[in-house]
Every structure is written in C-alpha cells, then in structure tokens.
UniProtKB/Swiss-Prot annotation:
GO terms for biological process: propionate catabolic process, 2-methylcitrate cycle. Its EC number is 4.1.3.30. One of its GO terms (molecular function) is magnesium ion binding. This is Probable 2-methylisocitrate lyase 1. It comes from Corynebacterium glutamicum (strain ATCC 13032 / DSM 20300 / JCM 1318 / BCRC 11384 / CCUG 27702 / LMG 3730 / NBRC 12168 / NCIMB 10025 / NRRL B-2784 / 534). It holds the Pfam family PEP_mutase. PROSITE patterns: ISOCITRATE_LYASE. The prpD1B1C1 operon seems not to be involved in propionate degradation. Gene3D superfamilies: Phosphoenolpyruvate-binding domains.
Length: 305
C-alpha cells in the first residue's frame, strides 16, 4: 500500500467515475469538506465524492459569493483526491473568470487528480444557487465558457459538467434550451440547479432525454428533497449532497460546545464522539507503523532488491 497517494491511478479513477455515471443505478456523491471525510465516504460505499465551492468557502469562514480562488479550490481538491480511490467531482463555480480562465481551471483540476468539474452560467462573481438575486450570463457566453473548458481537457475521461442556474431566473423552459446548447458545446453532463419539485425534475428529464443529468439535494434550499431511488426512477444519473456532512458536523459541534460551556465537561458527549481507535483505523495508523518499522530496521541488501 502506498501511504501517501491513491491505490488506483487517476486514469482508472476517471474511467470508473464515468462508468458509474452511465450505470443503471444512480451515482451518489456526498460532499467532502476535508480529506478525512472523503475517506469516510469511500468506506461507507458511495460511488463518488463531491467537493462543493460553498463548503470550501464556508471552511474558510467566507460566504459563497465568489470569494475563493482557483488556487484554493485546486489545492483542496488535490488534498481530497489524494486520499480516496473514488472519482472526485469539483465545483469550479464560473471557471474563475473569462473563457480562458475556465480553460486554465480545467487544466489545474486535471493536474489535481480529480475526475471532473462543473462550470455554471452565473455571472462572475457568482452567488449561492439557492439564493435570490442570481444573474446568469447570455447563453452564448456560457457556450464559450464550456467550449474553452473542453478544448483545454487532456484526458477525454475528465468529466465536464455544465450547471445552469437559469430555471430560477428565466424559467425552466429557458434552462432546458440552455442545457441543449451546453451539450452541443461539448458538456458531458448537465447539472440542473434549484429545481423546486419532483415534477420539475421529471419535466427536465423528459425534455433532455439522452444526456447525463445531475441533481442537487442540498438542505434548506429551494429544492424538495427527493430520495436517490426516486431520482433514479426519474432517470437522473447522479445526485450530490454538497453541504450535508458539513452541516451535520457543525450542528454537532455547536451543540457540544454549548454543553461544555454550561457544564464544564465533555463527558456527556463521549458516546456520540468518534472513538480514538476508530480515528486511528481511518487514518491507517497501523500501516504507517509497519512502514516506519521497516525503515527503522532497514539493512543494505536485506529485502531491498
């Protein structure tokens, strides 16, 4: 086992991720706000890992209004991709600028070892897709954004997903027409942001019958939460849970801190904590110990052919 990189090379991870998107069963991608969460997602048996721009911003105590940089996003994506054999899909916002910036974004994220990214049709700087007051660029501007990203791609298995926020701005029919244009520009998958109801998802799938579609099941937003089974029955190929793990973690942290402040001890939380032994197991402490022991006892000519 290589302790400091993946057990599966990036080319095979991308192939497997693309195959999962085309499989009969929906690919479920929980969001990871850290490499350790990504490893937990893999051990839980999911089909992929999602890295949310909103979560990267929140982890830096910033709002999701386009304040993070390509450097910050690529750095976190690389950290996460390093520790999991699953394909990682990254939120690349608007591509961090003009079409040439979108092209550079794809190059940087390919170098980071992820399986794909999505680009959106909001103006730059953007805002959270479930907030009011969003603005979208003209369709031809987003088409150039997608075309630039596709032209910069070196690995044909790197997935380029086009996200449209137009449903909440121009209406669902306009979003459908945009999706068709983005597919014509070379997008591999369409992310339909902030649809409201199951009926909306069915309507969108009926209008775009053959393309890969991704659904966003984020909490406390504009979208009714649908199960993976329902989305699969509708015909969606992937579903993300972008902020779920962060919200669970932060909810628990805030409750625990309040109790510690009130009672002066964390003892009441011990049965709700991850045990030290489980953390060590997740971190693969024993593998590091074996590696260290081998190096410590290394002798020239012994087991080093």
């Amino acid at each position: 086992m290589n302790l400091f990189s993946n057990g599966v090379d990036v080319g095979r991870r991308r192939q497997a991720f693309k195959a999962a998107l085309a499989a009969p069963h929906i690919a479920r991608l929980p969001g990871a706000f850290s490499p350790l969460i990504a490893r937990s997602i893999e051990e839980a048996g999911f089909e992929g890992v999602y890295v949310s721009g909103a979560v990267i911003a929140a982890d830096l105590a910033l709002p999701d209004i386009g304040l993070t940089t390509l450097t910050e996003v690529a750095h976190r994506a690389r950290q996460i991709a390093r520790v999991t054999d699953l394909g990682v899909l990254v939120d690349a916002d608007t591509g961090f600028g003009e079409p040439m910036s979108a092209a550079r974004t794809v190059a940087e994220l390919e170098d980071a070892g992820v399986a794909g990214c999505h680009l959106e049709d909001q103006v730059n700087p953007k805002r959270c897709g479930h907030l009011d007051g969003k603005e979208v660029v003209r369709t031809d501007v987003m088409v150039r954004r997608i075309a630039a990203a596709v032209s910069a791609r070196r690995d044909p298995n790197f997935v380029i997903c086009a996200r449209t926020d137009a449903a909440g701005v121009e209406g669902i029919d306009a979003a459908i027409e945009r999706a068709k244009a983005y597919l014509d520009a070379g997008a591999d998958m369409i992310f339909t942001e902030a649809l409201h109801s199951e009926a909306d998802f069915r309507y969108f799938r009926h209008a775009i019958p053959d393309a890969l579609l991704l659904a966003n099941m984020t909490e406390f937003g504009k979208t009714t939460l649908l199960s993976a089974d329902v989305l699969e029955e509708i015909g969606y190929n992937a579903v993300i849970y972008p902020v779920t793990t962060l919200r669970i973690a932060m909810g628990q942290v805030e409750q625990a801190l309040a109790e510690i402040k009130e009672h002066g001890t964390q003892e009441g939380w011990l049965d709700r904590m991850q045990h030290r032994s489980r953390l060590y197991e997740l971190l693969r402490y024993e593998d590091y110990n074996v590696f260290d022991q081998h190096i410590f006892t290394y002798r020239k000519g012994e087991n080093n052919e």
